[in-house]
Amino acid sequence: MATRSIGCAAIALIAVLAVALPAAAQRKEAEPPPPPSAIEIQAQPIPAFDHREPDRRRFGMLDFRGGLVLTSTFSEFGGISSLNMAADGANFLAASDRGWWLRGRITYTGTRPTGITAAEMAPMLGPDGRTLASRRWYDTEAMARDGNTVYVGIERVHRIVRFDYGKDGLLAKARPIEVPAAFRSFPSNGSVEALAFVPRGSGPLGGSLIAIAERGRDRDGNHLAFLIGGPRPGPFTIKRRNDYDVSDATALPNGDLLVLERKFGWTTGLFIRIRKIPIAQIAPGALVDGPVLIEADLGQQIDNMEGISVHRSGGETVLTLISDNNFSVLQRTLLLQFSLAPE
């Protein structure tokens, strides 16, 4: 009799759990996301880009304005892989490759960046309100902005998602957009690495999203790139030179494309450079190339530079770069600013 009672109780418990656990899971999924976390970011100024020539300002076609070494005790700070500067040159939005937003405001003394204020971080949210990380949508490597809409490229799952940032801010939910079928052929750690939005009204390709693969290449070894949306969607290629890989891109106000590149060798070290691709060259099926604006190595103040953005200030075009420290104590999170020298 006791055995039968225990058995009946066990069956009853299983029945209750069968109903209660899914209901609890649904309630958990329905819970609102936590609010953004205010964080403190310490900023150490970088007075010279090349410590061997501390008074030098011109590097290639760029003039060094200043930089910062950024640190924070917040556990999710680091791994910054993309950046968008607001038109005011102070407010910014960035993303880490772990799927976290970072926004804040750069302070200046004259034209030199001196600190970061009003910094906040929050996890990116998927379509159902769960975090991207919980969906295993890893490596949020690229970002581009079109007004109130922010596009983010997710490397490991070969996706591009859009956020209604203007409406919901850091609590916006990702909405996948249609991407070219070729994305599925990219290596899992070499998919979409760079996104740039061609400004509306800047020419025939205005309103197009440009996506560039890190290690997706054609049979000649050139970088695969894509015009998505806009008036003339389709693939094109960027000439690969000197073994550099693409790490980010951004569009100038006239539509010209700035491509941030890097290469690393255990015996040669780390190098970065920026190329300018005229927008007039870009079209479906085209092979494009352009001049190098700057090339730097570890003799200068660089690290694993993964984000680039542009804004206008005082009649100058200002480039802001940020590095991904891979959450390593051996690397740094650098924010660097340059102005584009007149041609």
Give residue spans per PLM region:
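Sequence/structural signature of beta-propeller domains
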Residues: 2, 6-8, 20-343
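Gram-negative bacterial Sec-dependent N-terminal signal peptides
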Residues: 9-17
